[in-house]
Amino acid sequence: MGMDRREFIKSCSLVAVMGLLFGCRKLPLDEVARLGDGPTLKQFEDEVKLAVSQAKKQLDLVKVSRPGSLSIPGASPVNRFGMAIDLDLCDGCGECILACNQENNVPLVPEDDAARGRFMHWVGMRSGAPFMCAHCGKAPCERVCPTGAANHTPDGLSAMVYKRCAGSRFCGANCPVQARKFNFNDAQKLGLARKFNKEVPLRDKGVMEKCSLCLHRLQNDRLKFKTQLSVAEGIGGASVKNASGNAAGNASEWRGRGVTTACSDACKRRAIIFGNWLDEESPLVQLTKDRVLYVPREIADLDPSVVFMRGRR
C-alpha cells in the first residue's frame, strides 16, 4: 500500500527534527564541557591540597616603592589595577587557589603531572604565600609574543587573547618567575575541565594562560558604569555608581571601585587586597600606605603591579 502525500511530509519532518536533536551538528568542545558533568569539586579541592603540600619554592624578595603610573603607550592616567599580598596575615591555606580555579575554569592535570607538581593553577604557592603573574609594567613576556596574544591593557593588566595564541611559548620562556602555564594536554577531551564560570572560556590545547586579575569582572563593571553613565546623561546628569554602589568622584571616569578578584574574595584573613594603585580611595592604596612593600628580585626592575607586604614603616 502506497504512502499518501500527507504521511510522506510528516515522515520527512520527523527525520529532520531527529537529525537536529541527535547529531546533525557537532557541538564545540567548549559546549561539550559545559553540558557534561566534568570533574567533581572534591577533585579540584584534592588537587589544590596536593599542590600546597608540594610547594617548596621560596621567594627572594626585595623592597620596592608603591607602583605608580604606567610608562607604556596609551596607559590610563587614572587606573592601574594590581594587588598586595600581606605576608603577616597569610596562613598559606590555599583557598585562594581553589577560588581562582573555579572562577577561571582552570583545569585539572593528569595524575603523573600532578605527582611532579606540574599544575595549571594560575595561583601557586611560594614561601607559604600565594604567587601569581605580577602584571609587570615592563613585561618581558609581551615583547616576545609573535602574534600579539600577550598584550598590556591601558589599565595595567598583562592580558591574554587566547584565540590569537599560536603556542610558541616564547612568553613563558621570557617570564623571569615562570608565572605562565602552557596547555600540553587537551583537558576537555581528557575529562579534566569543568566550566564553573560561564564568563570565562575554556582554553584549548597549545594555548598559554595565566592570572588575568579577573579581567572579566573589571570588564563587566566598566560596561555597567558606561551604561549607567549613558542613562544618566540622557536624563539630565543623575549620579553614576560603580560596583560598590558609591558614586564616582568624576562622573565620567570609571575607576573600578568595588571590584575584587576571586582570590581576594576567598581569603578569610583578608591577606589579598585588590584595587587601583592610582586611586587614593582604593583599599589597595589605603592599606599599603604605611607598609613595607616587596617583590621577587627577578622582576624588581620590571615595574610589577602585584606586590607583597610585611611589617610597617
Placement of each model-derived feature along the sequence:
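Classical protein tyrosine phosphatase
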Residues: 95-101, 170
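C-terminal segment of N-terminal export signals and the immediately downstream linker at the start
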Residues: 2, 22-81, 296-301, 307-313
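Long, compositionally biased charged/polar accessory segments in the mid-to-C-terminal portions
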Residues: 216-313
